[in-house]
């Protein structure tokens, strides 16, 4: 995949997606056809992350072509980024605690074989290894694949979610502190207590068009547990 850092390219991608592919988005968005075929998704997130194009602009442009009812799923996905940013801004201790935990865990796992094999794409899970290499080479992963990846990392490879979140931020062109951190927390089961995401063999096969076989995962793992809860921190913008 090629991401050219220019506003002209961002607008071109947006227009092409709306004209050619948006009408089928809700039906095809969960499929990962591989890095050479991203026609079913917009691939605009790197441009949003770096401020080249805004969520508002994307939504307004899409609504100029299709009605809200035909656009609803796409708009929902765009607004998740905005929601996560607002959620984290109101609870900044989630981010500061994550950084503290990450520093401790990195030292503990620096020689851990499961971790070293995971980041090198040398596990016994073919699809996971493929995604590690794809992430490093393309600096992008399909959103559904990010969920599978995180679930395998946490529940099958039994690695801390904090290390996985860092690994994504090291490589993703669209790495966003809020979406990434809270997304990993959600998969683990600590963002919404007791609700986690477990990747399954049948789901991966279905939504990758059977590109991968013999996917042996822990599909019965319980959610991770966190004793911490975070209250909204009142924002004070009075500079007087």
Residue ranges and their predicted role:
Residues 147:
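Short, solvent-exposed turn/loop segments enriched in Gly/Ser/Thr/Pro and often Arg
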Residues 1-143, 151-240:
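C-terminal catalytic domain of photolyase/cryptochrome flavoproteins
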């Amino acid at each position: 995949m090629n991401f050219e850092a220019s506003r002209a390219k961002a607008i071109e991608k947006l227009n092409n997606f709306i004209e050619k592919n948006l009408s089928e988005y809700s039906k095809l968005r969960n499929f990962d056809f591989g890095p050479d075929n991203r026609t079913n998704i917009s691939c605009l997130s790197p441009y949003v992350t770096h401020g080249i194009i805004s969520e508002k602009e994307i939504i307004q442009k899409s609504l100029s072509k299709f009605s809200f009812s035909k656009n609803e799923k796409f708009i929902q996905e765009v607004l998740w980024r905005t929601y996560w940013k607002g959620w984290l801004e109101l609870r900044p201790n989630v981010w500061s605690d994550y950084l503290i935990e990450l520093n401790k865990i990195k030292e503990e796992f620096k020689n851990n074989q499961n971790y070293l094999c995971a980041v090198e794409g040398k596990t016994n899970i073919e699809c996971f290894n493929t995604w590690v290499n794809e992430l490093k080479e393309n600096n992008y992963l399909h959103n559904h694949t990010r969920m599978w990846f995180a679930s395998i990392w946490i529940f099958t490879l039994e690695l801390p979610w904090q290390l996985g979140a860092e690994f994504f931020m090291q490589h993703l062109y669209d790495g966003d502190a809020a979406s990434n951190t809270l997304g990993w927390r959600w998969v683990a089961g600590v963002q919404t207590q007791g609700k986690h995401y477990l990747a399954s063999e049948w789901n991966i096969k279905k939504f990758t068009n059977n590109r991968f076989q013999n996917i042996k995962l822990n599909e019965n793992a319980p959610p991770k547990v966190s004793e911490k809860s975070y209250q909204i921190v009142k924002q004070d913008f009075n500079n007087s």
